[in-house]
A protein has these predicted regions:
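Bacterial N-terminal signal peptides
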Residues: 1-7
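A sequence-level/structural motif corresponding to short, flexible coil/turn segments enriched
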Residues: 10-202
Length: 202
């Protein structure tokens, strides 16, 4: 199953023009979860793949990244994963060109798994080389959903059925937000929720 990437621009009051489009993927199921523009005009795509997307599949769903120029030409693609399902759900490119990706893992993607699913966050350079990767969570189901990068680091938000900040999980899912510096060090994490289900997305 392939992923399509389409460039679009407005040619008038209502007409949408697609200067180019590309289709790419593995022979297995591929699902795109994020598209982000780089400072140089390139486009970065994050997806989950059950196939081989640049490297052999490590097991279940792997995380894959691809970079294209603003003319739709492939620059590189890469793939990383553990023995179980790993998915990217958030993608952001910092003003200085570093790529940050976050999501969830059901395995040991960047350390020992604490429970059902853990949050993970990773940083890559503009060439797709991994700089660092972090994993955190507790015994419940934890997911990272949205990532926002800035010059000095990155924010990640999501939801947790665990206790991430020494607070008490109120009921079901709580929302959380965390900030990491550019070297991957956790600066702070905050968890908030009500008696109902609460998600952090954005």
């Amino acid at each position: 199953m392939s992923v399509a990437l389409v460039a679009a621009s407005c040619a008038g009051d209502s007409e949408i023009v697609a200067p180019w489009e590309v289709q790419f993927g593995s022979p297995q199921a591929d699902t795109s979860f994020g598209v982000a523009a780089a400072p140089d005009g390139d486009v970065v795509v994050a997806l989950a793949t059950e196939g081989a997307f640049g490297q052999p599949n490590a097991g279940g769903r792997d995380v894959a990244l691809a970079r294209y120029t603003n003319e739709g030409l492939a620059v590189w693609q890469m793939q990383v994963g553990g023995e179980r399902n790993d998915s990217p759900l958030g993608l952001s490119v910092s003003p200085d060109g570093f790529i940050y990706v976050g999501g969830f893992t059901e395995g040991a993607f960047a350390g020992e798994n604490a429970g059902s699913a853990d949050v993970w966050l990773a940083k890559f350079d503009r060439d797709g080389t991994e700089i660092w990767r972090q994993q955190f969570g507790d015994k419940g189901w934890d997911r990272g959903f949205d990532v926002t990068a800035f010059d000095g680091g990155v924010y990640i938000t999501g939801y947790t059925a665990s206790i991430l900040d020494l607070a008490t999980n109120r009921e079901g899912f709580d929302g959380f937000a965390a900030r990491f510096d550019a070297d991957g060090n956790l600066e702070w994490i905050s968890q908030v929720g009500t008696d109902a289900a609460d998600w952090g997305q954005g």
